[in-house]
Curated annotation (Swiss-Prot):
InterPro entries in alphabetical order: MetalPrtase_cat_dom_sf_prd, YbeY, YbeY_CS
UniProt record, GO biological process: rRNA processing
Assigned keywords, A-Z: Cytoplasm, Endonuclease, Hydrolase, Metal-binding, Nuclease, Ribosome biogenesis, rRNA processing, Zinc
The protein, known as: Endoribonuclease YbeY
Gene Ontology CC: cytoplasm
Disulfide bonds: none
SUPFAM superfamilies the record matches: Metalloproteases ('zincins'), catalytic domain
Origin species: Klebsiella pneumoniae subsp. pneumoniae (strain ATCC 700721 / MGH 78578)
């Protein structure tokens, strides 16, 4: 049986109204086990200032972002279940959900799914990579009972 050990860190000033730990666990359990038997990851929920600082330091982008993924790379020959860390900015997620007319819980789920796929090595820099990753995100979100997170983009095409 596959198992995902989740370390949820609440590093944002306002913690009321956040999804509970059971939801975060459900979301990572929907993504990771098909790819990796045993896994450990940290999800850190932060405010704008920390997201902005990390995004500037590690991506060179001078603004906060919704989710940052920091994969863990074990030294050669050492097997470790540690996947890495997700840093999710509460205010950015809430603002995006509002602007995009998406249910807040669904957008939180999408950020966890999206970030977890990055930890597993997926990316969306090239078009073919983006198509594969977005397809997986959609499949997982539908399996979780949420709408396709890219439906508005598909309708616009």
């Amino acid at each position: 049986m596959s198992q995902v050990i989740l370390d949820l860190q609440l590093a944002c000033e306002e913690t009321s109204g956040l999804p509970d730990e059971a939801l975060f666990q459900r979301w990572v359990d929907a993504v990771i086990p098909p790819f990796q038997e045993e896994s450990e990851l940290t999800i850190r929920l932060v405010d704008v200032a920390e997201s902005h600082e990390l995004n500037l330091t590690y991506r060179g982008k001078d603004k906060p972002t919704n989710v940052l993924s920091f994969p863990f790379e074990a030294p050669p020959g050492i097997e470790m279940p540690l996947l890495g860390d997700l840093i999710i900015c509460r205010q950015v997620v809430e603002q995006e959900a509002s602007e995009q007319g998406k249910p807040l819980e669904a957008h939180w789920a999408h950020m966890v799914v999206h970030g977890s796929l990055h930890l597993l090595g997926y990316d969306h820099i090239e078009d073919d990579e983006a198509e594969e990753m977005e397809g997986l995100e959609t499949e997982i979100m539908l399996a979780l009972g949420y709408e396709d997170p890219y439906i508005s983009e598909k309708i616009a095409e």
